[in-house]
UniProtKB/Swiss-Prot annotation:
Belongs to the ARTD/PARP family. This is Protein mono-ADP-ribosyltransferase PARP6. SUPFAM superfamilies: ADP-ribosylation. Its EC number is 2.4.2.-. The modification ADP-ribosyl aspartic acid is found at D580.
């Protein structure tokens, strides 16, 4: 096979000649290779001009009339913790490899698509999701695309732009002054005072943060597609970018729009998740049965062994949360989501089905899940065989518990926040990139502080998968809402400890003195086991979260009980677990400068690493 790596580097031109260069590429180059379509040259040059020379690379396969176009998508805008949760390398671009007909380009067969990161060899699930999305996008575009159609649209567009000067100047203007998109993920700021505080530089930062932007035209009368955009996708990340710079730029723009919001869509059907409190951090499958079957068939849920090996303490916690929710008297309300698990003996049926809940069967399978401590002490395959003998649904249930978690949880080194007096400390991030971007914008305007949120261990199975929701006046509410609707927080640990221990029928709020007497016993009660034990030893668990909250006028402070009605203004940061009533100091106040300094020290090394 004749394979030649051909990279095209042509000099740019200005003024009146810019149109011909942009639309047709450099004709001298095409004269030597008549089989290479000039529109392909033009589209490649457009990528180089709008992005950079390094954003595209080409390899020709002359004897079979094929060409591979590698488009490099910069994902450095993702936070370090987000990229870790998604298992991508933010320092390395994602490569979209499209194979076209060299001589026919858009008139030829639909291009094949590969999505990869050169250094990311295993577990690149995000690439599978993006490949599926871009495949569907290309199939839709290919129904009306042709070289002549694209050339005609670009010529019309260029004629319209001539009065405004060169194309480069126009693009520069677009890159600076393009409006903030009207997107469900990034709503337009309506508050007039807020608009006043946001100057032009701040708007530019906001536009860069909100990378799920679609390319929308300021003048809606100018139609560059030849057909109106679908109303179903109008106004969010599924908007079809303009074709004015060619198909290669269009698909790059579409990929850039979709990447920051991949967590908001099902990895199988690409339909938006429906959650009470918006999207979560990790991409996941939706609850549609067809998607569940496809998800299982694709083998995406086969990562249990890796998770147990690399994050055994986290898996231990997830199982404990699932058990607490399943054994709760309120399980019909709080055990949500209910597992969707394919029957290993009959892959066409669901052994556990949210539409046909069977808590007794689920309890039996969960009881057969061996302790994570045991799993780490031997061969995972041998452990799996033992579980299969006990109950064939035990291992599939464990896979579901791991894969359905949509938050990023990492066990911290022992006693990172020493004032919390527990070895079971976790970094807990559940907010998707869109919410974190909105949170940071609000933080710049109003500032933030830290406060505790107490909720019983049985509630966290749902919180990790559905988010920290405003449960006031809903069936999820347990403690009342004396201070109105919102997420309840407190700067005082004793108050949150009280909420965290009230999940089993106790509805009276203990006084602070009672809590101090009951819980502040770290130095008076003999320890029956090492406090530094790696895994949870007991099923009698208490937990609280440490959250970062925006200090805007929306935050209502009623003494030491705070209520935040805006869910976007609360982000979980840390999670602490205590066993057998052994909890920390009940007098911790997050507003104490010493406490704040310690929190910021750990936050600086764990959350804002970039």
């Amino acid at each position: 096979m004749d394979i030649k790596g051909q990279f095209w580097n042509d000099d740019d031109s200005e003024g009146d000649n810019e149109s011909e260069e942009f639309l047709y590429g450099v004709q001298g180059s095409c004269a030597a290779d008549l089989y290479r379509h000039p529109q392909l040259d033009a589209d490649i040059e457009a990528v180089k001009e709008i992005y950079s020379e390094n954003s595209v690379s080409i390899r020709e396969y002359g004897t079979i009339d094929d060409v591979d176009i590698d488009l490099h998508i910069n994902i450095s805008f993702l936070d370090e913790e987000v990229s870790t949760a998604w298992k991508v390398l933010r320092t390395e671009p994602i490569v979209l490899r499209l194979r076209f007909s060299l001589s026919q380009y858009l008139d030829g067969p639909e291009p094949s698509i590969e999505v990869f990161q050169p250094s990311n060899k295993e577990g690149f699930g995000l690439g599978l999701q993006l490949k599926k999305i871009l495949g569907m996008f290309t199939s839709q575009q290919w129904k009306h695309l042709s070289n002549d159609f694209l050339k005609t649209q670009q010529e019309k567009r260029h004629s319209w732009l001539k009065a405004s000067g060169t194309i480069k100047k126009f693009r520069a203007g677009l890159s600076i002054f393009s409006p903030i998109p009207k997107s469900p993920s990034f709503p337009i700021i309506q508050d007039s005072m807020l608009k006043g505080k946001l100057g032009v530089p701040e708007l530019r930062v906001g536009r860069l943060m909100n990378r799920s932007v679609s390319c929308t035209m300021k003048n809606p009368k100018v139609e560059v597609f030849g057909y109106p955009p679908s109303p179903q996708v109008s106004g969010h990340c599924k908007n079809i970018p303009t074709l004015e710079y060619g198909f290669l730029v269009q698909i790059m723009k579409y990929a850039e729009q979709r990447i920051p919001t991949l967590n908001e869509y099902c990895v199988v059907c690409d339909e938006q998740h429906v959650f009470q409190n918006g999207s979560m951090l990790k991409p996941a499958v939706c609850t549609r049965e067809l998607c569940v079957f496809s998800f299982y068939t694709l083998g995406v849920m086969s990562g249990a062994a890796e998770e147990v090996a690399t994050g055994a303490e986290v898996v231990d916690l997830l199982v404990a949360m699932c058990r607490a929710a399943l054994e709760s008297p309120r399980k019909s309300i709080i055990f949500e989501p209910y597992p969707s698990v394919v029957d290993p003996t009959d892959p066409k049926t669901l052994a556990f089905n949210p539409k046909k809940k069977n808590y007794e069967r689920l309890q039996k399978a969960l009881d057969s899940v061996m302790s994570i401590r045991e799993m780490t002490q031997g061969s995972y395959l041998e452990i799996k065989k033992q579980m299969d003998k006990l109950d064939p649904l035990a291992h599939p249930l464990l896979q579901w518990i791991i894969s359905s978690n949509r938050s990023h949880i990492v066990k911290l080194p022992l006693s990172r926040l020493k004032f919390m007096h527990t070895s079971h400390q976790f970094l807990l991030l559940s907010s998707p990139p869109a919410k974190e971007a909105r949170f940071r914008t609000a933080k710049k305007l109003y500032g933030s502080t830290f406060a505790f949120h107490g909720s019983h261990i049985e509630n966290w199975h749902s919180i990790l998968r559905n988010g920290l929701v405003n449960a006031s006046y809903t069936k999820l509410q347990l403690h009342g809402a004396a201070y109105g609707k919102g997420i309840y927080l407190s700067p005082i640990s004793s108050i949150s400890f009280g909420y965290s221990g009230m999940g089993k029928g106790q509805h009276r709020m203990p006084s602070k003195d009672e809590l101090v007497q009951r819980y502040n016993r770290m130095n008076t009660i003999p320890q029956t086991r090492s406090i530094q034990s790696r895994f949870l030893q007991s099923r009698n668990l208490n937990c609280i979260a440490l959250c970062e909250v925006i200090t805007s006028k929306d935050l209502q402070k009623h003494g030491n009980i705070w209520v935040c009605p805006v869910s976007d203004h609360v982000c979980t940061r840390f999670f602490f677990v205590y066993e057998d009533g052994q909890v920390g100091d009940a007098n911790i106040n997050t507003q104490d400068p010493k406490i704040q300094k310690e929190i910021m020290r750990v936050i600086g090394t764990q959350v804002y690493t970039n």
